[in-house]
Amino acid sequence: SRVYSIERYKTLADMAKKRLERLNISNVTILLQDGFFGYAPQAPFDRIILTAAVEEIPSFIISQLKVGGIMIVPVGLPNQKQSLLKVIKNEKGLDITELMSVRFVQMKEGLEKV
């Protein structure tokens, strides 16, 4: 299986690539790009993990999840209590379970200069 990780900070992408190389992990691709809309070229995915909060579950990311796939996503407004949700896509829609309260940075569009 293959893992794709999208990073909007060049320094973090470079660090991740070096660490994976040092650990001899070869099934992970680190992409330096805007991940706001997911990664449609390799969709659909078995699993999706968002590591930044969204105000609501993005339909364009759900569309990249296979039926039977699982997404972990922090949902909520900035600087407020957010919920970490487990979303399972099934034939009829979504099965959503709240896992815990969390606080994540808000998801942003674009690349950072650093």
At which residue positions do the language-model features occur?
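Core SAM-dependent methyltransferase catalytic element
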Residues: 83-114
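Conserved nucleotide-cofactor-binding alpha/beta core module
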Residues: 1-81, 85-94
